[in-house]
Amino acid sequence: MSMDIPETVSLRKFRDFSARQKQELYETLLELAESIDELPKKSLRKTLELTLAVLEYKGEQVQQLQESAAGGLSSDRRLQDENEKLKRMLQKLEDERDGLKSKAKELGEEIRQLELRLQEAAQQAEISDKDSSDPLSELDKQEQLLQNIDSKNKHIKRLLKEIETLQNQNIAQSKTIVLHERELQTIKANLVQLSQDITKVEQERKSLKQKEQQQALEITRLEGNLTFLEVEREKQEVEMRQFLDKYEAKSLGWRQALDDRDKEVERLKKQLEGKSISSGQTNSSNSQSQQEEEHAKLRQLLESREQRIEKLEEKIKSMAEEMVSSTRAMNQLCQEKERAHDPEQPRACCQMIEERLREATARCQQLSEMLEAAEQDNVLKSQQALHAISALEAYKRDEDGLIPALRRCSGLEQKVAARDKQLRAYIQELNSLHEVVQENELLRRKLHIPDDVVIMAKNVHSKQRNKDKQIERLTLKLRTSEELRLQLKLEKSELRRKLLELQQDSPQTLNESLQAPSEVGEVPHSVHLENSPRRGQGDGAASSEMQNRYDEVLAENETLRSGMYEILEKLREYDATSEHITIDSDLLRRLIEALPGGTTTPQRLQGQLLELKAREEALRQLLEQQNYSDSETGELSSVHSLCEVPEIAEEHPVEEDAVLNTATRPSSPTEATMGLRRPTVPDPEEKPTNEALAELSILRKHYDELRLHMSADGSDLMNRNQELHDQMIALELQLEQQRNSYSYMRRDYDQLLTETRKQELRFIDDKASLARQLEHSKSELCEAREELEQVNRRNLYTAEEQQKLEHRNAILSMQLGQAMEQLLGELKPTEICAEYGIIRENYQLDYITAQDFEEQQQELLTWRSKQAELQRETKQLEGLLHVANEQIHSQQRLLNEITDNHINLRHLVADLQSSSDEKLMLAKVQRDLDSVKAECSRLETEREKLQLKADCLQTQLEASELSLKQTQQDFQQERTNSDIKHKFLQHSLFMLKDKYAKFTPLVFLTNFVFAYQKFQRRLEEEQVQQRHRDHTALIDEVTAVVQAKIGLNEESSQQLVKLIKSETQTRLLEQRCEILQAKQEELVRELGELRMSQATDTEHWSTIQALFGEGEPRSQLKVDAETNTDAVAPNLAMRRAVQLIDRESSPIGSPLRKHPHLDTATQTLEAQVEFSETAVQTNGILSQQNQAVQTADAVEDNRRDSRAELQKMQETLQEANQRIEILGKQLEASRSESRESASPQGGVVEKTILSFHTLLLEKDQSIQKYQDLLQTERDQSQQALSKQVAENESLRATVNNLNFNIKTKDAEIQGLKEKLRQKPEVPVERNPSTDSRSSSSSDSSVNELTDEKIEELFESSSVERPPQEELEVPVEAGPENIVTEEPEGEEEKQDTEELKEVPTLHKQIKDLKDKLEYSERSLKTREEEVDILKEKLKLCQEREKSVESTVNPELDQLRIFLDEKDKHIKDLMDTLKNFHDDQQRYIKDTSNFSEDQIAKLAADLNRTEATNKIYHTQMEALRRQLANVTQREKQARDLSQSLRQQLLKRPVVSIKTELNARVKNENQLKRIQQLELDLDEARGQLQRQQTLLEAKRTRSANEVQLWEKQKRYQQQAEKTKARLEETELALEKTRALLQAARTTIARLEKDKQILESKLGRNGPPSNSSGGNNLKCCRTPSCPNLQHVGVSKFAPSPSESPETYTGPSSECSSPAHHHTQIFDQSQLDLIEALKSRIELQQRKIIAMELEGRGSNALTTELEKLQERCQAIEAQNIRLEARNLQLQLDSDLLRQGDSSDRLQKRIKHLEDYIMALKEEMARNESRRELGSGLKVSTNQGQSAEQTILSLRNLVEKLRSENKFLKDGRRSTESRSSMDSTPAEAARLQQQHAEALEKISALQQELQKRTTKCSQCGGRSKDAANEELKFIKEQLVKKTQLLQKAKVLLTRAAAKEKVLREQLALWKRKCSELQNVPVIDEISE
């Protein structure tokens, strides 16, 4: 069928097939491998096509499967996990199967051995049948068999014991495991406890930290208070001084007034005296009445004066007293000041406040404790009352009486007893289990079994059952044997009876002797012994020997008979159980005949006859003795009568013994017979004569005694009779007793008999069941045999052969494995993957058949079902166990409850018995409390259990997670391995050409690869040729076009310029192009080599993949992305073939199909690259290349980039070639023209001159245009700036208005404060903090502008200047012939940059507007706060009215409060403002943070929020609890009151004793203590939670602050980076411009020098013009001004745009000079121009094309020197700038600026001196040197300036270090709290410093004017520079001043705000008990 596949199935048919048919075809193709040689050659191709199609179909299937796998990964994982589980199950089942197989083998061997034994037994049986003539030998064999069985039984017993020991060990192990688990649980619990302890410790630590922080805050607050008090004290001192001054002035005034009065009094006295004398002299005649009136007047005046004097004296006294009091007050104040200064002694006010606080807190605590105690007492009393009432009611209803309680107690005791029994039983079970575990451990140790190994007990149990069955069988056999023995005994007794019947004809004596009552089977030997005392006398030695022999024979017969019976029974059993044992009927018949013959044996009859003979002999002897003593018959008869009683007494116990013997059967029949027989057999022959003589002597003694008796008295006889009578009574009693005992024993015997019968019946039943079991086992054995036979039939080989084969197979497999390992080591299995089949680790193969696989599947299903059943059973068992545990727990709980009830009842009984009702109540309460406590403890234990459970579950979860991870990892690894194996299998199918089969002709692959290589080479050659062809054609076309253009439009000068430009560009581009081309070629070559190597190494589909796998999509992409290039591709036909092969051959999906996302990524990457390439211009290709190299990580990306760049370069190269062609033609044309112009023709000369003039005019026009454009743009920017300035001004005005409003508000606040102060005498001083605050708030907006923006504005101005200077460089270099186009483009860029700066200014304006809005908002908030403060003020005033005694301190406190609150408000406003600014910045600059940081911060914030929420909820819950508690307390109080009333109403039952009261009090105290402890714990928990909350809040606040700081730092860093990048860009631009300008200027200057030298040779007028030139030229590259332009090439902030002037008429337009000289020396000028052009051409050709020559070298060196100098100067400037900024910042931080200013002045002086020295040197050099010396001087001067600047930088650095060190040492509070006097001093110093600076500046100006007069025009630039530097210095000083002012303000603000914050925090915490962080964070 396989031969006809190609005929029956074609490709078309195959495609129409269904999936099943395709699968069948695939399988048939796989089967083809066997019959591969039979295939005909013609159908090979078709089969190959078919196989390829099948493989393609399979590949598609694989791809679909992979897609589905990729789609449903989650389900796949689950399935894989299940698969893993099933694999493990399979592995286990296989292991078990192997074990079962091995067991089956062992059983088979055992069965064979048993069969052999059975055969041997059968043979022996046959032999025994044959040799049946000898029954003894048969018996021997039977005995041997029995011995074997016994040995087997012993072996079984030993095994059973071992199994038991193993089980015990197992149990012990399980117990130890349980113990270990418990230990583990305890350890876990301990761990949990430890972790809790750790958390507690951490919480305590945190609380301590918080306390420390609080203390620190308190310290800071106290320090603030101290400073405030100091300030107040100083104020009071000032006031006191003022007061004293006033009073002193007043006192002085009073003294002066007093003196005046005294003088007036004296004068008046003198006047009076004078008047009195004059009146006495002149008017003696006047009447007495007038004198009296005058005297009265004078007296009145004097009295009035005296009164006035007294008043004044009183006033003076009062003043003196006031002075004294004031001095005392002053002294007190001084003392207080000293005390305040003393740091150890605390202040009085603080002490008072602290003491009061302490007292208040102590009082509060006492009150709270009293309250709590009272409440607790109330609760307790209410509870007691309730319980008492309930108890009383119960008592009344007889529910709680004594009798029911006792009944309950008894019932409970019974229950307790029952529980105790149960517990004991459980304990016994547990002990037994422990013993089992110990036994198991011992057994494990003995057998060396490790603890981990689990031993299955099923087999052991089954074996044990079998052994038990065997034992039961054997016991049954024993019982049957015993029954047989019984039967034998019965038969024996029957025979004896028959014998006795036969011997009835014997004498009467015998009959009498035999008539004794006897049991069945008893030998009546006792009677004979009693009746015949002389039976031992008789025969001699011969008879005894015969008797012995006879006895031996009898015993042998008996043993043989019993053995025969046993053997017969065994044979019957064997016959029943086994098929093989067959007993002959003859043998059985013989045995049966032999056995009953034993009943009538002659031995027994002979024994009986002998006995009878012995008896007869004894009777004869007795008769003879009677005849001998005939005379003494009467005496003898009396003796006999006397002796009969003891004989009778001796007979009874013998009989009873006999009865007992019959009841107790002997174990073996032989022993019984012997025991019965030995005493019965008499030996009359053995009795000697001496015995008879001894008897006679005894009889004589008796006779003598009788005689004595007879001769004795009647009394003696009576006594003797009495004794005998007593003896007889005793004997009768004994007999009665013995009878009773006998009856009892008889009853017992009957019971035992019935029991034995029942047991026999049971044994019969058991026997029947065993027989059934035996039948069942037989059937099983038959089945096993059949199976064994089947196995034997299957296994054709014997066991030995099988073993040999297995051994050989193992050796071969080992060899094969080694060979495979070696082979795979050579083949590199990592590359090829793995072999086909089930691949092991050693790369061996196992093939499995379909049948085996199906069997395995079925087994798997069965095992799964079994597993499901087992799981179900285990679940059920677990459920049962759970239920049992719950029951146990419930029982334990019940027990506990019962015991508790029992105790309660006892208490109740005791309470009832006690007389007092209070005792009863207390007992009840105590019981309830105990029950509650028990309940609490139970709940606690349950909680702990739950915690443990949770921990266990957590650990289990973690373990499961770990295991899951591990399994996932294992699964991944296995999956990768399986994938590798799968791939290797697929590969190996196609690698069979070398190993197994030759149905796939893959030989053409190598040829194909070789052909492909050839094809590639041909393609490359063709491409190279095409390139060459295209190139030449293009050049031809370009040359033609250029010639046409040159012929028509262009002039020679323009051509020359273009030529030079294009040549330089093309050079550069060529070099770059060559480098990139080389790179690209190398990469392409490497790629090709790689592909070829891969193709040759791997299989055919891999080859195709390697060669063409990535070809199509990538080429398409390239065509789409790069429209200019064509992808290198083979022919269409070739590609089609490749596609067909790829589609048909590769069974694995191509990597392009597998990974579509990779393609998209590459597409996007390529697109990005292309986009960047299109955006970049031609001059930036190198930088772009570098970027590409940096960004590309893989070789593929590099290759793509290099290709793209190469294509670009090729384009640029083509353009350059075109340009070269054009320029070459232009050059040729210009040369020809120059040659033509060389001929002396006037017209041509005029034309050339005109062309030059036109060229210059055009250039001037273009320059003018650019200048106009620049001017317009500048005007526009100026307008925009002016607008912005106006806007800024308006904004500032608004800000000022707002500040004014704030000031008014502050004034209002001040007014309110003044109202507060009630003393009108003390002058109200305004608080400096408010002033500073108002000033700071007024300048806040300006400060913000100046702080943040001044530096940026200054930098922007300095950055704006250089581009303008750079723009003017090419403008000045305009009039020359050769002008580049690049600077113009640069100018445009700079203009656009200037325009770009406008939006930044707009942004600034927006920011200002935002700030304005914010300030308005803040004003509103301020107003609201003012209102609040007013309200608070009112409240404070009311309080002050109420509290009159403490007015002053309260006023001070209010003032402090107001200040603090203002500060706090300000601080909050600032923090809010900062927060808003940070938010806005963060929103603007989100890119500053990385995503990870943001995510972390967000997570932290979320966490903190969550924790805060949790804490809030906890707090709320606690509050609710508190509310509930309060409600309950209220209810309890009400209840207690009601109960008290009830108790009062109730009659008193009993009198309270002191003892009871004491006990009660003690109990109550204990309870109170306990409840207090509980309350303290609850409070502690609350406090802990609060502290935790506060800690969390502080942490979150700290985190927020850190975050804000980080944001600020990042923003600053970003700003600085941006500035740095801008400066670098500006530097690069200026460098490029300068390089271009230098090159052009250097060339022009050299040409100029040559021309001037030529002109100098020709005539004097040219010299004058040259001198003129030298005078007027002011370009930076001019050789006349080389010493001036030291630092011109790199623009600096010190240079302004005004230093450069526009192009002067003298210097910029050479046409002017030419027109002056044209008339005089026209021909000379033409010659000079010609020579100049020639020189230029030569130089250009020499420099640009060859790149060699001394001129080029010199120019290059000059360029390098200039660049070096420029860079060094710039670096120094930047360093100086950086140091300056650092110094400024340090200065601002330090706070004191006097030393800094002095040092700054000193540095400025040094700098001016250095500049003077430089100027002097320049002058001297200018006077001395010229020509080459000039250049050297220039270099030296540059070096000197650099050195001086470096020295300056060193000084600045040292100063910076000093400042940094100084700042660390001087930072303290004293520096922060600088007084106004110090500020004034600093201002004075600053003014002096400014004066010094101005003086120095004036001196400098004078010197510079002198220098300018001396130096002339050359010093102008230096003067301008100096002026600029001065301006800069002035600006800097101004900036410094502003910064200082701002810093001082900021420091003051900060201080005030800190104080405010501290106070506000304190107040808030005191008033509201709310943490301050909450307010800030919210």
Swiss-Prot record:
One of its GO terms (cellular component) is centriolar satellite. Residues 1379-1391 have a biased composition (Acidic residues). The keyword Coiled coil applies. Residues 1-650 are annotated as: Necessary and sufficient for function in ciliogenesis, transition zone (TZ) assembly, and recruitment of DZP1 and Mks1 to the TZ. Also required for subcellular localization to the cilium basal body. The keyword Coiled coil applies. It is found in: Cytoplasm, Cytoskeleton, Cilium basal body; Cytoplasm, Cytoskeleton, Microtubule organizing center, Centrosome, Centriole. Keywords: Cell projection, Cilium, Cilium biogenesis/degradation, Coiled coil, Cytoplasm, Cytoskeleton. Residues 76-384, 471-505, 853-887, 922-970, 1192-1233, 1405-1439, 1501-1654, 1726-1935 form a coiled coil. Residues 1313-1324 have a biased composition (Basic and acidic residues). Expressed in sensory neurons type I and in germ cells (at protein level). One of its GO terms (biological process) is non-motile cilium assembly. This is Centrosomal protein Cep290. It comes from Drosophila melanogaster. The gene is Cep290.
